[in-house]
């Protein structure tokens, strides 16, 4: 293996007493928790795009980083160098998975033919890197939003030829994801929305994206891809309004096109913030609807209205997220991908490690707090008691469709006393959660 991060040894667990910034204090991959290794509960992944493709450019300034793998030269050779750097980073960070967009790992080229050739070359190289390091692919996806051709969307584009081009791109990346043993394939519609209703046919675009998703499902079975298909909700940015606004919106879309048993969701914390929801809300909603697939672990900024993609650092927030996931049985093919980037002023190579190490420890500590909540059982007991009336014969008959509205109304007329309002005890439960986290 090449050594581009020479001063960094493979990151290991040193415990809470460690002051080493290049060590885990809470993440012990082999620690057994509820009968499963910590690494198997969390299933961490590093993203290719923020760490190895972004050069520090923002809306108001040019690239602030001087990454040696981003210097000028032959695009395909630079992609090979970037793969060397990325896999050394994955290996030294000691995480099991990574994620990519197609053009993160292979140059797009000047034609579809050149794009397909470059993907083929890089898929062989990535396969070799995976075998060498033991790092696996959590998910792959096609970038159908950056190129100017996708300014008006990919599957929702009014130009049929652009729809076709996006279809070709997705076909190639699904094949590549299968070849590399990817456990999921993600569909994120960054441009699947509108800027103005004045030039938009909402019904037409909805039919287009619905048919596109149906074809993606068909193609999954055609090529024998065994992974999970995921949609990543986001309300806006880069478009004014995206059709995959939040988890509930995505579920309604899936139901409309008969896809609710075929596609799940990849939930990003910062996207929940932009939609006006808590991270826990989106995760809990997906679980309630049976469509939780995977997580993009990051954080936004409540004072800012855009996707800041910061590393997660709140144990308080993520303990409740991990509690929801544990209560639902944990991940199957999904995991925790750090869709996060260092700040533009964090220009040192080591900053990439610091950001991920802090995020990994945050999620590990959150897992431990979530286990306390689950094992103690007091929160579950309270919720069960609060809804206990629905376990009665009457409650079951209502939910099973055995009673009509007027029959329930007649039951209400037989009540001797008015129903009593009961305390929700939110403050007590908040205190209880704080004890699990901070005691």
UniProtKB/Swiss-Prot annotation:
Disulfide bonds: none
GO MF annotations in UniProt: magnesium ion binding; xylose isomerase activity
Active site residues per record: 101, 104
Cofactor binding, note field: Binds 2 magnesium ions per subunit.
Catalytic activity: alpha-D-xylose = alpha-D-xylulofuranose
UniProt keyword list: Carbohydrate metabolism, Cytoplasm, Isomerase, Magnesium, Metal-binding, Xylose metabolism
GO BP annotations listed: D-xylose metabolic process
Chief localisation class: cytoplasm
HAMAP family per the UniProt record, alphabetical: Xylose_isom_A
Family to which this protein belongs: Belongs to the xylose isomerase family.
The protein, known as: Xylose isomerase
Species per Swiss-Prot/TrEMBL record: Photorhabdus laumondii subsp. laumondii (strain DSM 15139 / CIP 105565 / TT01) (Photorhabdus luminescens subsp. laumondii)
Upper taxonomic lineage: Bacteria, Pseudomonadati, Pseudomonadota, Gammaproteobacteria, Enterobacterales
Name of the gene this protein is made from: xylA
């Amino acid at each position: 293996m090449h050594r581009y991060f020479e001063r960094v040894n493979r990151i290991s667990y040193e415990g809470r007493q460690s002051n080493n910034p290049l060590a885990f204090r809470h993440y012990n991959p082999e620690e057994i928790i509820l009968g499963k290794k910590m690494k198997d509960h969390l299933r961490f992944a590093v993203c290719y795009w923020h760490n190895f493709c972004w050069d520090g450019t923002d809306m108001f300034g040019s690239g602030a980083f001087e990454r040696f793998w981003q210097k000028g030269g032959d695009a395909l050779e630079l992609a090979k160098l970037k793969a060397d750097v990325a896999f050394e980073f994955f290996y030294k960070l000691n995480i099991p998975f990574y994620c990519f967009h197609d053009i993160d790992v292979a140059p797009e080229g000047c034609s579809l033919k050149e794009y397909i050739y470059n993907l083929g070359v890089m898929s062989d190289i990535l396969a070799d890197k995976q075998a060498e390091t033991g790092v696996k692919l959590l998910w792959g996806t096609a970038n159908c939003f950056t190129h100017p051709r996708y300014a008006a969307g990919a599957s929702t584009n009014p130009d049929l030829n652009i729809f076709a081009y996006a279809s070709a791109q997705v076909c190639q990346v699904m094949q590549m994801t299968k070849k590399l043993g990817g456990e999921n394939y993600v569909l994120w519609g960054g441009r699947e929305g509108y800027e103005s209703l004045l030039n938009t046919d909402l019904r037409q675009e909805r039919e287009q994206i619905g048919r596109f998703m149906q074809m993606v499902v068909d193609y999954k079975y055609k090529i024998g891809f065994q992974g999970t298909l995921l949609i990543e909700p986001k309300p806006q940015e880069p478009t004014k309004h995206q059709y995959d606004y939040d988890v509930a919106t995505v579920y309604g879309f899936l139901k409309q096109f008969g896809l609710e048993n075929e596609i799940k969701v990849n939930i990003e914390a910062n996207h929940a913030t932009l939609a006006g929801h808590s991270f826990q809300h989106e995760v809990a909603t997906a679980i309630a609807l049976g469509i939780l697939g995977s997580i993009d672990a990051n954080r936004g900024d409540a004072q800012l209205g855009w996707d800041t993609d910061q590393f997660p650092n709140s144990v308080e927030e993520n303990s409740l997220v991990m509690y929801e996931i544990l209560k639902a049985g944990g991940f199957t093919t999904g995991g925790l991908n750090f869709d996060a980037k260092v700040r533009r002023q964090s220009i040192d190579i080591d900053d990439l490690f610091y950001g991920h190490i802090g995020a990994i420890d945050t999620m590990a500590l959150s897992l431990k707090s979530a286990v306390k909540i689950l094992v103690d059982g007091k929160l579950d007991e309270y919720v069960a008691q609060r809804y206990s009336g629905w376990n009665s014969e009457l409650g079951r008959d209502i939910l099973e469709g055995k009673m009509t509205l007027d029959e329930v109304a007649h039951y209400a007329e037989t009540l001797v006393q008015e129903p009593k309002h009961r305390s929700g005890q939110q403050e007590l439960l908040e205190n209880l959660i704080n004890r699990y986290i901070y005691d």
